[in-house]
Curated annotation (Swiss-Prot):
InterPro entries assigned: Aldolase_TIM (IPR013785), DAHP1/KDSA (IPR006218), KDO8P_synthase (IPR006269)
Short name of any one Pfam family annotated for the protein: DAHP_synth_1
Domain of life: Bacteria
Name by which UniProt lists this protein: 2-dehydro-3-deoxyphosphooctonate aldolase
UniProt organism field: Pseudomonas putida (strain W619)
EC number: 2.5.1.55
One example GO MF annotation: 3-deoxy-8-phosphooctulonate synthase activity
Length: 280
């Protein structure tokens, strides 16, 4: 079990935690608007909640794509979100120098999938002492995550969450191996596993400079993943996904957040009401 705040704990056996927000900080107003709706819905449904957003999308497909406001402005917006709503925050870092200042503001740091094997970045994240969400690289098998986990532990940090966002299947396509969740639990000491349903819905247009997506399938994929019994769900929503500056095709429309989460909570409650059944 990983303690995020005094009141929020993340465990595969506990009620799921929602790591939800927007993809990238487009503006302060959008961050506050989105967070307000997440807070309203999660408080109504009784779901533990962590706000998520990126201050820099450093791995965009095109050099011309919007990346975000940068670290300094991003941290200012995060402080405003915290002051207004009192929610914990998760965000990703891409450079070693970002780790310490970001850790002063946010509650959970995130290691991006494309950077998950970068040892110097792993060590810098570990040294913050903050919980770290490790995104499983699309090119890595679930069992190989234990090597990344071991790096963190040897660097002095065992406050780890593992996140699956799909695996490459051929070219320009991601699939989610539902059996992989159990493999990560067994090989990584039952660390909390969360499911990034938003980015698992990405697909690529080989001729395009941005990711496509399949948001019409978000309910199916989220139900399937959370039916395994996971510690959390990682989700992005937007008031107008077609106008989002990053990953709009995979984003849930914000006005569908309440009915969507009501279904996921009902499923999570049901799955975790079952007694353990070990077959070997």
């Amino acid at each position: 079990m990983i303690k995020i705040t005094q009141n929020i704990e993340c465990s595969n056996a506990a009620p799921f935690v929602l790591f939800g927000g927007i993809n990238v900080l487009e503006s302060e107003d959008l961050a506050l608007t989105a967070c307000a709706e997440y807070v309203r819905v999660t408080e109504k449904l009784g779901i533990p909640y962590v706000f998520k957003a990126s201050f820099d999308k450093a791995n965009r497909s095109s050099i011309h794509s919007y990346r975000g406001p940068g670290m300094e402005e991003g941290l200012r917006i995060f402080e405003k979100v915290k002051a207004e709503f009192g929610v914990p925050i998760i965000t990703d870092v891409h450079e070693i120098y970002q780790c310490a200042p970001v850790a002063e503001v946010v509650d959970v740091l995130q290691l991006p999938a494309f950077l998950a094997r970068q040892t110097d970045l792993v060590v810098a994240l570990a040294k913050t002492g903050k919980p770290v969400n490790i995104k499983k690289p699309q090119f890595l098998s679930p069992s190989q995550m234990q090597n990344i986990v071991q790096k963190f532990k040897e660097a002095g940090n065992d406050q780890l969450i593992l996140c699956d966002r799909g695996t490459c299947m051929g070219y320009d396509n991601l699939v989610v191996d539902m059996l992989g969740f159990g493999v990560m639990k067994r090989t990584c000491d039952d660390l909390p596993i969360i499911f990034d349903v938003t980015h698992a819905l990405q697909n690529r247009d080989p001729s395009g400079a941005a990711s496509g997506g399949r948001r019409e399938q978000v309910v199916d994929l989220a139900r399937a993943g959370m039916g395994v019994g996971l510690a959390g769900l990682f989700l992005e929503a937007h008031p107008n996904p077609d106008q989002a500056k990053c990953d709009g095709p995979s984003a849930l429309p914000l006005d569908k957040l309440e009915p969507f989460l009501a279904q996921i909570k009902a499923l999570d409650d049901l799955v975790k009401s079952f007694p353990p059944l070990v077959i070997g």
